[in-house]
Structures are given as C-alpha cells and as structure tokens.
Amino acid sequence: MVNKEQFYDQIRKALEDGNTRYYRNLIYIERDDYFDHVKEIISLFLNFKSNPSVAYGFVPWASGSKERMRTIKEYFSKFDDIDYANAEYYLGNTYDLVILDTVDNFQPINIGRLVDLARGGGLIIIYTNNLIKDKTFRTSIMRNGLILDEYEKRFKRKLYEHEGIFIIDVNEYIPKPFSGNTMPKAEKKVPRNPLMPKEIHELSLSEDQNRVIESFTYLLSGGQRALVLTAARGRGKSAATGLSIAGLIEKLRERKEKSIRIIVTAPSIASASQVMSFAKLGLEALGEELSVKVSDTGHIKSLRGDYFKLEYVPPDAAIEDEGELLIIDEAAALGINYIDLALRAWKKVALVTTVHGYEGSNKAFLRYLRRLIESKRIRVKWVNMEQPLRYAKGDPIEKWLYDALLLDAEPSEPQYLNDTMIYEDVDKSELANDDNRLRAIYGIMVTAHYKNNPDDLMIMLDGIHHKIKAIRIGENSYIAACQIAEEGELSDNMVDIALKGGTFDGDLIPDRIIKHVRIKDFAKLRGWRIVRIAVAPELQDKGFGSELLKMIYEEARDKGVDWVGSSFMSDQKVLNFWIKNGFIPVHISPKKNEKLGDYPVVVIRPISDIATKIVKISAYMLKEKLLNTLHDVYFNMNPEVVRLMLTSTKIVSKTINVSPIILDKTISFLQGVSPYESSADGIHMLTLKYFWDGERDWSLTQDEELVLIAKVLQGKPWSYVSTVLSSNRTHIYELIYSAISKLMKKYYNLTADSKVGLTLKDVMNSQQYD
C-alpha cells in the first residue's frame, strides 16, 4: 500500500514512460470525494503536458453533470464535451486526455468507444462516486426493481488485474505501473517501386497502410474481383481506404478515356466520412482540382474532378447504381444479405469492416462472407491490418479493455465429442468469476453474430430475468449456448403504454404483439425470448442448435411457460433455422434497423392454447400486412426473406376470388397477345391467391416464387430482379410466364389454348358486378 504522495509520484513516472514508449495509462476513481481527486490528477497531467487536447464524456441532462463538465473545461483550451449518446461522431478523433464521467451512467459501449480515443503517451480518467448506484443503463436492465451486479464486480476485478492502471478507491491508492514491452511506434514505409502513386503513400502513417494501399491495385485486374479489408478499431483502415480510392482514380485515368465513377456506401454518410475525407486528401496531393459537395450534416457527399466522380450513395440505392468500383465501409453492419446483392450487381467491390473491438463483427461475419464469396467463385484478396496508429502495439490499456469488455471472446475448441451431452442451467455468479467458462460460453454467442455490442455482456450477467442455458460435453467443453429473457405478465399500465405507442425497456415480444396485433391478452402470458442461441463454429449445421432449442422448449413447457420466441435481423439463413424448428413469424418491423441494416423479425412457438390462438391470428395479420404493403413499406426487403415469411405462414389462409375478366386477360398473356404490363393486374391477383392458399399440397419453384415476389408484389425494376436471380430480363419474363401458366392450370384448368372472349352473361354470373 502507498500513500497519496507516493501514488501521484508513480503516476508521474508512468506518464513519462508512456510518452517515451507511446503507451497509455488509466486512472480509475471511485469514492465520494471523487471530484477533488479528478482536479488533482488534471493539475498533475498539466505539469506533464501543458496544452493537451481533451475529450470529456458525460450525460449532459443528468443533474449536476454540466456543472462538473464546466468546472473541468476551465482547465483546458482544447476541449470537446461529448454526450455519450453522440460519441460515434468523435470516433475519428484522437486526444491526449480522455475523461469519462460515470457518476450518472456506467455503460460498456461508452467505455469501449471513448477509451480508444486516447493516443500513446496520453491518459484516461474514469471517475464515479459508486459504480453501481443510480446508473441510467443499470436501471434500464431492471425487472420489478431487481438487478444483479455481476458485470460491475468483474469489471472492477479486471482493473486490479491489469497494468498501466492506477486505482483510487474508498480506502486506498493502488498503483499498477506497466512493466511490459511495446513495439516501436508505427511508421510508414513507402515501397521502393510502388504500384500506387508515391504521393498517396507519403500520406500514410504506417507500413500497414502502405501495404493496404498497394493491395487495392488488385481490383484493377480483369474479371469479377473483391477485396476484403479487416482491422480492429484504431488501425487506420478508413484512412487507408480513402487514400487507396484516390490512387485508383489516378490509375484508372491512365487506362480509361471516359469519366470514372466510384461509389462509396456505408450504414450512414457519417460512417463513410473518414473514407471520403482521406480520398479528398489523396486527390489534393495528386494535384486534382475538386468540386466538393457537403451534406446538411457537414459530411462530404461527393468529390468531382475533370474526369471522375466519387460519391457517397445510401446502401439500397448503391445496389442499382453503376460505376467502376463499389466501396462498402463497415460492411458487417449492412449484413450478408446486402453484400450478396452487391456482389451480384457489381463487378468490382471492396468490403471494409471492423473485426473485434467494441463494434466489431467478430469471426462470424468473416465466416459467412467467406462462404458467400466461395459460392460465387469470385476472385478475392483478404487483407488484415494489425498495427495500431493511436498507440504502440502492446499498449496495456488496449489489453485491459479487450479483457474487461470481452471484445475478443472466442470459443474454445470442443473436446470429448463422444461423451454424453449435458443440458446446463448456467449459474451467472459462478460464470462471471470463471474467465475460462465465460469466454467459452460468451465466445460461442458472439462468434455466431455479425455485430456485437459490449452492453450485451452486461445485460446478460446483470439482468435478473436473463438466463443462460448451454450444452456441454464432459466437464467444461461447451458446444452450444443460449441467452433467454423472461417476458410477459405485464401490468395493465404497461399494456396501456404500449397501446398508446409508448415504449419500455424489456418485454420486446409482448410489446410488438400488443402494438401490431392489438390483443391485450398476450401481455398477461409468460414467455421466454431467446436473445441469442449459437453453436461452436466447428459443430455448426450438425443439429446441435436445434437440439438445444428442443431442450429449452421442453423445459419451458414443463415450467408452465406460454410461449418461446425470438427476435432477430431478417437474415435468410437465420430465419430458416427458426422456421424449420417450428417457430412461426408473427411480426416484421416496418422500418430497417439503421445500425444493423435489416428488418427485425419476431417468431414464436406457442405452448399454451391461448398462445396458439393469438399466434395464429398474428401470423394472419403479418401475412396480410406483407402482401398489402410489399410495394411500399417493405419495398427494400430481400425477396428471399419475403418468400420464407410467406411460405412459413401456411397455417393461415384466405380465399382470393379472381374475376372472369382478369382470367380472360391472363389467357391473352399466356398466348403472347397481351404484354406483361397490360396483364399485371391479373398476374398480381393470381400471385396473391397463391400465397394466401394454405391448403395446397404443391408449390412453384423457388425461382418462380422469388420472381413473383420481387417483380409482381414489390414492383422492382427488371434490372433488380435480374440481379437477385443472377439472370437476365428474358429469363425473368420466362419465369413469370411459367409461374402464371401453372397457377392458371392448377386453380382454373385454363391454358394458353383456352378460348378467350366473354359474354355479358359470363361476367354477370360471376357475382362480382351485381
């Protein structure tokens, strides 16, 4: 144990060493007189660095928070006060000092985002009066006023375990200076005979970036090609991508006489801002005179020169756009379905994404992506960046952050596959205190999802209504894991809130059913929502996920639960997994999730009689909503997902009557007399009849169903439908003809050889014109 003076002296030495070796230090303060210590640490840091750049994270609307911020701001001339809710807009910045006020809220995503903004030689200060008491995010996880604190206990334990961290708590000062090794600071290394312009290479900050810039020339060669660039946060991938675009424009100019067009897309224009900014920097270094268009939010929208245009285009529009190259930044956030369409529509594609880190896609995305590209037989180059730019490799705070937030969790390899499978109800307190088990179970969960959030672990460990189920083989070899949230049994007041459009934390599935199906009885039922279910990568597609789901369903039934359900992004493969296990789609959001790039879906497998009745009604309402609004609300929904939704709700049906006039016009279409455009109303009616028919024991081919959905129900352009089916307009037309021929024959025994023309009596006898 040391006294305050000795403690501060060790901090001074650590700051000097950190500056020399380009690593960061962190000070954690948790005590009632926290603010006095914060001010003392700031004074100490100012003696070390007189005019630092500062990022200050806080909750501006909380009582007293602005006063604390203003007091601290007086110490500095370069000061960014950052509302945690808007932290993503500062992710490209770097600071000497990062201060995180966690008095009002302790939330892992805020720690993950802002700690990484500190540069080597810099300092991070995290301060609070109490890590658990009166915290906004913790309150949102509570159920019936109850919550655990397993996550916070583990977080504090990790502070004590790692180096480069100095702790001021209620009773003592605990210095943990860094004694490890770091790699030298990243430096550029311009290739001796570069393929890209030397001016572009000179703008890089690391040898890693130089390597990436050269790698982008892979896209200049013939045939369909993709480049996949992955990196943890802080490696400079967006900067390298932007500089590479500038270099490619210069190389393309040497080859092409016509104007060059390159499209950049991302979940938002803000997400693409770094790519566009560094492309501008690179083009200016090449001596280009640029016309720059900026969005209302201040982000670069397009760069135009005499012979080229570089433009940000929203994801859906980018699919149908044209140009030499499509750049997809933060590709994992847009999902595999989107990338599939992009690879069908574009000849040259660069996919850039974060792996690991607080917003990383982890290995699941890369695994799905590798399968997708292999199935298309596209030439691909995989490039990974490892050298951090903001700080030295070996930085102790990065090591602590990844461990504390489990940003690099990976499952262990399964052992003892010949042993008996054991279904386990996992004790969360034991799990939080056993890093090997926690990494094994949580690692399985995160590797199965494209996009992960550090908050997920806190919700799982602290939520008293969140349970963990797993299958293990032997003593400690986990092969499948599941996180369950208990939902339902809502009060009348919560039901009224939902019916009036209000929202509340938790109870996701009851909320959606109340809002969209309007049946209040569902709110009183007990349900288990499966938040995540996953299988170790080596054992996927072998039935273990279905086996775990079966065990969970049987346990729920035995405990008197009314339903088991789940909500997830509308990925075709994931949706198919739930459907084949007896789950019924009951809701799809009318809006895309902007961060995850797809439409959230709700599926339920009912247990009780009342749940079964409500689920059937919900499935009917969903089918009606889809078939009535695919041309509008769900115009951008993947047709393959629509097909699964429609064909999996055959438990509900409705009779669609088609008039003799419509049928007669459709015969003319089959005879080649009436073109598609003139017969579209009849084709549309027959399509509705087919998808509403829950009693048929036959089906069209998958391609025929897809073309009816994309062209007839969604009203997509011929070019888009051709892209979806990797075909051409002639073949698409033939598929429509084939499908309508079958429907006319099956339902009405009519063919292209049937007679055309009606009498008034024929029409009046149909009883549709009385």
From Swiss-Prot:
One of its GO terms (cellular component) is cytoplasm. GO terms for biological process: rRNA acetylation involved in maturation of SSU-rRNA; tRNA acetylation; tRNA wobble cytosine modification. PROSITE patterns: GNAT. SUPFAM superfamilies: Acyl-CoA N-acyltransferases (Nat) (SSF55729), P-loop containing nucleoside triphosphate hydrolases (SSF52540). The keyword S-adenosyl-L-methionine does not apply. CDD domains: NAT_SF (cd04301). This is tRNA(Met) cytidine acetyltransferase TmcA 2.
